[in-house]
Amino acid sequence: MISLSSVAIALTTVVGALALPSDQSVNLAARQAITSSQTGTNNGYYYSFWTNGAGSVSYSNGAAGQFSVNWANQGGGDFTCGKGWNPGKAQDISFSGTFTPNGNAYLSIYGWTTGPLVEYYILENFGSYNPGNGMTHVGTLTSDGSDYDIYKHTQVNQPSIVGTSTFDQYWSIRKNKRSSGTVTTANHFSAWASHGMNLGSHNYQILSVEGYQSSGSASMTVSAGSSSSGGSGSGSGSGSGSGSGSGSQTTTAGSSTGTGTGSGSGSGSGGSGGNCAAQWGQCGGQGWNGPTCCSSGTCKASNQWYSQCL
């Protein structure tokens, strides 16, 4: 996972910190303080905690998707922690709680993909430093009640989930900061793809709290909504022709029309346009249980895990 010192001038060592923990898979039945790096499962959620060992930081897992952390890292300390899923996916993620940093810290939906290797952030709140200041701005997105600035940044020879590598970071940084709400991740994944920023197969995905040379506290709860999709409607139509021609149909969300052409006999019928994903929405992939049709555009596979309406 990324060290907050990573991007641009103010961020020099960076990312992949969450990739560094040894592969300890610890099932914790009771709440307990964690002060050394580890990953595991707790109450049905994947969790990850990493610290560089400087300063003071204490992480605790709570019931279901709840976790808390207190830190005082002014002397060079760096940590990242949170709960979520492994693997992640395009899904609506709800979160709530308190995030009270004093200095440089992030609250984000954070994850990795492979093929290509990508580290991504949907940054919902941050402390004294906006990491976008050191990255390349590629566009904007409006989602979940706010505009987000989209950035891309390349990490060269930095820690990652597959070891030291060169890889891209994708960022969406929310303009109206918040500590509670729902993130429609498919909107971000689709917006990134529209700028040529494609994801691969999902690795872990968590609600993350990070702090670098700062102090503060956070108590957060994360939960999953439905897999992200969009667009609904219904319609019916029919078409007929005489002679040996053929019928054709056009269906859009909410309405459809059918036409028949030719000099023989033919017919076409328009079907339902309901329950189809909107443009940029997810429409397929391994394990996907949502809509597999598109109300606009064509369903195209990005990889075995993710197809979207383009």
UniProtKB/Swiss-Prot annotation:
Residues 1-19 form the signal peptide. Its main location: secreted. Induction: Induced by soluble xylo-oligosaccharides, with beechwood xylan being the best inducer. Optimum pH is 5.0. It is an enzyme of class 3 (hydrolase). Optimum temperature is 50 degrees Celsius. It catalyses: Endohydrolysis of (1->4)-beta-D-xylosidic linkages in xylans. Residues 275-310 form the CBM1 domain. It comes from the Eukaryota. The keyword Secreted applies. The active site is at residues 119, 210. One of its GO terms (biological process) is xylan catabolic process. Pathway: Glycan degradation; xylan degradation. Residues 228-246, 257-274 have a biased composition (Gly residues). It is found in: Secreted. Keywords: Carbohydrate metabolism, Glycosidase, Hydrolase, Polysaccharide degradation, Secreted, Signal, Xylan degradation. GO terms for cellular component: extracellular region. Residues 218-274 are annotated as: Disordered. Residues 33-223 form the GH11 domain. Belongs to the glycosyl hydrolase 11 (cellulase G) family. This is Endo-1,4-beta-xylanase B. It comes from Penicillium oxalicum.
